A protein has these predicted regions:
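Glycine- and aromatic-enriched mobile tails/lids
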Residues: 1-11, 20, 28, 42-44, ...
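N-terminal Rossmann-like FAD-binding beta1-loop-alpha1 element of flavoenzymes
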Residues: 13-37
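Short hydrophobic core segments
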Residues: 14-16, 208-218, 380
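Glycine-rich loop(s) and the adjacent beta-strand/alpha-helix scaffold that form part
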Residues: 212-266, 270, 398-406, 412
Length: 458
């Protein structure tokens, strides 16, 4: 029997990953750019969908120094200072762009954005949508991408390698090798392949030739027994980078979140958002006693919980919502409450068992301020990449912001060959009308319109 060969595919940009970094990059490319996006699982099975707490934003110019210091302090001052500066000064234009796409952040009575606070933040600066901020943002970005005729999404397709060749006298990335996979990451049967391109056969590797390649494959939680990540996130880009000698950085910088909902069973752990502690929830030991300051950086709180578990001889400690106003619990933390009710615990009336669990990868494939890796024509953004913004320990709610900032910067550099300018820290604050405040928002105005939206009014 003759074996069918999958035809090669061609595009201008191939994006491995459909989280916020990949989606936002696609939206910031011209509609004349042919884009293919790969999702290793279903398109909504990305860690961006799971982000609960919110997304940081510079609420006013006077907060710049404090925001910078909070990020550096959480990262043990091992952060790349240029990256921290870029992220903070890009934050308001990103938020305004999300608002233009219909992202529904919580607001005060006067119509201005409401901000919450989380651990290691010196003030409230986190925009949020209940306790499902990541889902709200990712869903709106995905809706915008699906309106684009120039973007094709292939679900249940994994990147297994990159294509390389000479370009401008150097070895460059010329695309990727991919293969359709099943939900357990095994090769998919031919009759079950969903959303495949015409001529691509299940189980057979195929090539996607592209001018530019963006890695946005997420983290590494799938290699851990207990993680808040989806199991298919197994650090694929890092393995491929190692095989090709692509520069990586800080592979030992792995964040353990203090409060995963305890379960003795292996698999994905449900995250209990840090914003719960930001709103007043407290940690208790087996004797019902508070034992630490809950608003310290994540690694510090994790260490305190582990030490208390050792003293108590337990596999978990307890998180109590007793100090939190009941309407905040039922409103802000409705999703968390519903999940805990599935385990027979109502956070309105009793504490819940929590334990540290793998959550985030600060290291990864080294990139510069424009998302460029050490290999020409290969970019990376989001948890896959290490731009140094988080240092040794990520500040709460900086992950979505970082992914969006570098997804956009990578797209801009692909498009123009130049770095995207950022606003000055002293610009006016976001107000109730959510004005567009920065030069880079204006610069992507045409891209937003191309995505079926319009920029926030100037």
């Amino acid at each position: 029997m003759e074996t069918k060969q999958c035809p090669d595919m061609e595009c201008d940009v191939v994006i491995a990953g459909c989280g916020v970094a990949g989606l936002y990059a696609a939206l910031n490319l011209p509609t004349s750019t042919r884009v293919i996006m790969l999702s290793k699982g279903a398109v909504d099975e990305c860690d961006s969908m799971l982000a609960q707490g919110g997304i940081c934003v510079l609420p006013e110019g006077s907060d710049y120094d404090a925001f910078f210091e909070d990020t550096m302090h959480a990262g043990h001052y091992d952060n790349r200072r240029e990256s921290v500066d870029i992220m903070i000064r890009s934050s308001r234009s990103v938020i305004n762009d999300l608002l233009a796409m219909g992202v529904d952040f919580e607001r005060k009575a006067d119509g201005s954005l409401d901000f919450t606070r989380e651990g290691a933040h010196s003030r409230p600066r986190i925009a949020f949508h209940a306790d499902i901020t990541g889902k709200e943002i990712t869903t709106k970005l995905l809706q915008a991408v699906r309106k684009l005729d120039n973007v094709q999404i292939l679900e249940h397709v994994a990147m297994t390698d990159i294509l390389t060749g000479e370009r401008d006298g150097a070895t460059a990335c010329l695309g990727v090798v991919a293969v359709p996979v099943d939900e357990d990451n095994s090769v998919r049967p031919a009759d079950e392949l969903a959303n495949a391109a015409e001529g691509v056969h299940a189980g057979e590797p195929f090539k996607i030739h592209a001018r530019h390649t963006l890695w946005a494959t997420g983290g590494i939680g799938g290699v851990y027994d207990h993680s808040t990540n989806y199991p298919q996130l197994t650090g694929d880009a890092c393995y491929i980078a190692q095989e090709h000698g692509i520069k990586m950085e800080h592979l030992d910088y792995v964040q353990i979140h203090p409060t995963g909902l305890f379960s003795p069973q292996p698999g994905r752990t449900f995250l209990i958002s840090e914003s719960c502690r930001g709103e007043g929830a407290i940690l208790l030991n087996a004797a019902g006693e508070r034992f630490t300051d809950e608003l310290q950086p994540r690694d510090v709180v994790t260490a305190a919980i582990r030490e208390q578990m050792k003293q108590d001889g337990t596999e978990h400690e307890w998180l109590s919502f007793a100090p939190v106003e009941r309407d905040v619990v039922t409103g802000h933390f409705a999703n968390i409450r519903a999940r805990c009710l599935e385990d027979g615990r109502d956070i309105l009336d009793e504490p819940i068992p929590v334990t540290p669990t793998q959550h985030y990868f600060m290291g990864g494939v080294w990139v510069d301020k424009d998302g460029r890796t050490s290999m020409p024509e290969l970019y990376a953004a989001g948890e896959t990449a290490c731009n140094g913004v988080h240092g040794k320990n990520r500040l709460a709610s900086n992950s979505l912001l970082e992914a969006l900032v570098w997804g956009r910067r990578a797209a801009w550099h692909m498009r123009t060959g130049q770095s995207l300018a950022v606003e000055q820290a002293g610009e006016p604050a976001l107000d109730g009308r959510h004005r567009a405040l920065s030069a880079d928002t204006l610069a992507i105005d045409d891209l937003a319109r191309a995505a079926g939206t319009q920029a926030v009014e100037e």
